[in-house]
């Protein structure tokens, strides 16, 4: 399952993400991963959660990002949840590219039984309507 936390900058997306990470970490019988761009969430995320600063891995663009997510799922079958903050800063602000990325992530999440949640910094009206065929609103 793919979920999107959508809203403009300052609308509380990261707070929702942090709360969801905490809840998933407590409920999960496996591992929870949180991906961020930069070290902003270090003190907000539970220590049991695997916090990954994607800048340390040279990931730029949606193709590299998809490969990175595949590696996480392939490398550890116990991952139950992946949370991603600042999705558009990792991939790009091109909403068409975001749609194609989400189309690829959905089968990955289903095959690996992993819930993947992204924050997307924009108005929902800016996104292609088709994106909700592949992801649900958080």
Stretch-by-stretch model annotation:
Residues 1-73, 126-130, 135:
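Conserved P-loop
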């Amino acid at each position: 399952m793919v979920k999107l936390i959508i809203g403009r900058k300052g609308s509380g997306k990261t707070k929702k993400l942090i709360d969801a990470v905490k809840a998933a970490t407590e409920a999960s019988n496996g591992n929870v991963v949180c991906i961020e761009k930069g070290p902003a969430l270090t003190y907000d995320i539970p220590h049991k959660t695997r916090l990954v600063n994607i800048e340390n891995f040279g990931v730029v663009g949606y193709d590299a990002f998809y490969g990175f997510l595949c590696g996480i799922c392939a490398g550890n079958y116990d991952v139950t949840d992946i949370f991603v903050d600042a999705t558009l800063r990792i991939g790009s602000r091109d909403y068409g590219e975001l749609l194609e990325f989400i189309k690829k992530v959905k089968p990955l999440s289903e095959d690996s039984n992993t819930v993947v949640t992204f924050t997307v910094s924009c108005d929902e009206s800016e996104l292609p309507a088709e994106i909700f065929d592949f992801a649900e609103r958080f």
